[in-house]
């Protein structure tokens, strides 16, 4: 069966944005042409790919299957086109990175700023994911690499490199100031409201294991989707939370938050680079990866 690649390209954008009009705008085309192309694609493949409504489109199971195959190819073709137009001086190019919110906040944003200052012509595509989702994006070929926080599970074929260790601290709002002069243990935390990330997060798994190792049970009163949400909830006096020290430090210094001390030592975690060493990177991505790994090596030497 021969199907024009242009149809698959259009399908990728329609599926990505779940909207014919928006896909047409991105492709510099018009909505009737996009609709016609997708009708032709469905006819040639002899299946329905979209469920159409006034609010846009959703993928059918057949559409989901096709998108899972097309997405990786589309991203790699985009990268190939952009790399061919790049110069040796990195005046043009693109980097796609999947990252966790914590990794972005306490590590990656600073590295991106330095890189963008030196190479302003390089386009950056940053996607915010949980650690498992970020690793999956690398495995699927949807991004050049991922910057994640441990714990992380990496399968064969992918490589993980530690870039920077970090520590977390137990913090609370001003109403918990009296506790700051005490030393608590994990079992005693059951008597105080605790804020954690949701059940599916690797951070939640990390702390669940940490509590179990000390014969305590993690029972949060409030669950949040992101560390930024946790920080907002802590500042709103809704409870205590384990936060990355670099994120909490400014608020601890200003007195907006207080640090609580534990008898148990919270294990350190790491910011890590995850990439597929079987898949070559474009010039810009390779340059940025080298910058990250060199910085990580210097960090390891200072330990």
Regions found by a protein language model. Give the residues of each.
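Short helix-boundary/capping micro-motifs
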Residues: 12-30
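Alpha-helical linker/hinge and terminal dimerization helices associated
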Residues: 44-45, 66-88
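A late-sequence structural motif
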Residues: 107, 258-302
């Amino acid at each position: 069966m021969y199907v024009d690649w242009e149809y698959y390209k259009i399908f990728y954008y329609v599926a990505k944005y779940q909207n014919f009009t928006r896909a047409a705008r991105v492709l510099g085309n018009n909505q009737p042409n996009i609709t016609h192309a997708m009708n032709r694609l469905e006819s040639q493949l002899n299946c329905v790919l979209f469920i159409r409504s006034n609010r846009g489109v959703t993928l059918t199971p057949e559409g989901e299957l096709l998108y899972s195959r097309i997405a990786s190819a589309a991203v790699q073709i985009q990268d190939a086109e952009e790399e061919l137009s790049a110069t040796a001086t990195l005046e043009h190019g693109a980097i796609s990175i999947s990252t966790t919110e914590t990794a972005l906040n306490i590590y990656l944003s600073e590295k991106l700023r330095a890189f963008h200052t030196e190479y302003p012509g390089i386009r950056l595509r940053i996607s915010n994911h949980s650690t498992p989702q970020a690793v999956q994006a690398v495995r699927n070929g949807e991004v050049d690499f991922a910057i994640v926080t441990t714990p992380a599970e990496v399968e064969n074929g992918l490589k993980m490199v530690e870039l920077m260790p970090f520590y977390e601290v137990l913090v609370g709002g001003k109403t918990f100031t009296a506790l700051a002069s005490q030393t608590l243990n994990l079992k005693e935390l059951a008597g105080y409201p605790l804020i954690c990330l949701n059940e599916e997060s690797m951070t939640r798994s990390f702390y669940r294991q940490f509590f179990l190792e000390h014969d305590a049970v993690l029972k949060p009163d409030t669950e949040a989707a992101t560390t930024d949400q946790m920080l907002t909830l802590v500042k709103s006096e809704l409870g205590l939370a384990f936060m990355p020290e670099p994120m909490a430090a400014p608020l601890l210094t200003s007195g907006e938050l207080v640090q609580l001390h534990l008898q148990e030592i919270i294990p350190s975690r790491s910011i890590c680079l995850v990439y597929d060493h079987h898949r070559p990177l474009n010039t810009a991505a390779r340059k940025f990866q080298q910058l990250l790994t060199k910085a990580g090596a210097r960090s390891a030497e200072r330990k």
